[in-house]
Structure formats: C-alpha cells, structure tokens
Amino acid sequence: MSRRKKTFKREIIPDPVFKDLVIAKFINKMMIQGRKATSQKLFYGALKELEGKVQGEEPLAVFKKALENVKPSIEVRSRRVGGATYQVPVDVRPSRRLALAMRWLVEYSRERGEKDMAKRLAGEFLDAYNNRGNAIKKKDDVHRMAESNKAFSHYNW
C-alpha cells in the first residue's frame, strides 16, 4: 500500500465578471508571474474584441465553442515494452482535455502577429471557433499521431 499522501485538487474561485470556473481556469493559465489582474484585463479585452465579429453569437459562447473545438479526444503515450518504446494511443481524461485546450490556445495566441495580447487572443478564439488556426492544427496533429499508431493500441493497460 502506498505511503504517499492523497493529493487534493485546489478549489478554484470563479471569475468576478461571469462567475464561471472555466474562465477562471483560463485566466490562471494565461497568468505570468502572478499578475492576475493583467491576465483578467487581457481576457475581458479579448471578449470585447469578439463582440462584433460573429453574427448572432455572444463572445462568451464563441470562447466556449472555440475551447470545445480545440479539446483533443485521444493522444499518444510512450510505453516501454521489451526494450522497444511504442507510442500507444489512449483516451484523454476530461480534466486533461480542458487543460491541453487552454494551454494550446494561450501558447498559439502568444505566437500570433497582432499588436496586443487581447487582439491575439481574440484572433485565436475566432480561428478555433471556425475550426482553423494553430491550436486546431495542434489538435489535428495529436489525433493524426494517435491514428497512425493505432496498431499499438493493444498495449494500452
């Protein structure tokens, strides 16, 4: 039996504007060096940028749909079997799906060419909403990798 203490998930406080846990997690994921106020300002600025862009859709709905489009359903894990390392496709658990989607959205919005971060975020949200952009490309790469290694799926235990 393990002697290690059981780990508990931290309770995340919902964001002050929308009272939403997913938004709070995204803001925390964006945060650099503990500057939460800056991160919040950028996120809400990005939502403000989205306001006129999509007809008949609220900015929050665009964000949620973009996040849903980026979530991977399957990924590969390295598994060592008899001296050889195989890339074994496994299902992604829901909490990791969300974390990966957020990480990719933040990462690829930072690489964009727009002037300020709010515009970059808004652009990446729009691209993900329309199923294009770098975050979607990353998800497709992960799915393609899992598809090409489907032969090793029996090593999944």
UniProtKB/Swiss-Prot annotation:
GO MF annotations in UniProt: rRNA binding; structural constituent of ribosome; tRNA binding
BP GO annotations: translation
Family annotation (CDD domains): uS7_Bacteria
SUPFAM superfamilies: Ribosomal protein S7 (SSF47973)
GO cellular component: small ribosomal subunit
Keywords attached to this entry: Ribonucleoprotein, Ribosomal protein, RNA-binding, rRNA-binding, tRNA-binding
Gene3D superfamilies according to UniProt: Ribosomal protein S7 domain
Task of the protein: One of the primary rRNA binding proteins, it binds directly to 16S rRNA where it nucleates assembly of the head domain of the 30S subunit. Is located at the subunit interface close to the decoding center, probably blocks exit of the E-site tRNA.
Family according to the record: Belongs to the universal ribosomal protein uS7 family.
Name by which UniProt lists this protein: Small ribosomal subunit protein uS7
Taxonomic classification: Bacteria, Pseudomonadati, Bdellovibrionota, Bdellovibrionia, Bdellovibrionales
Gene that encodes it: rpsG
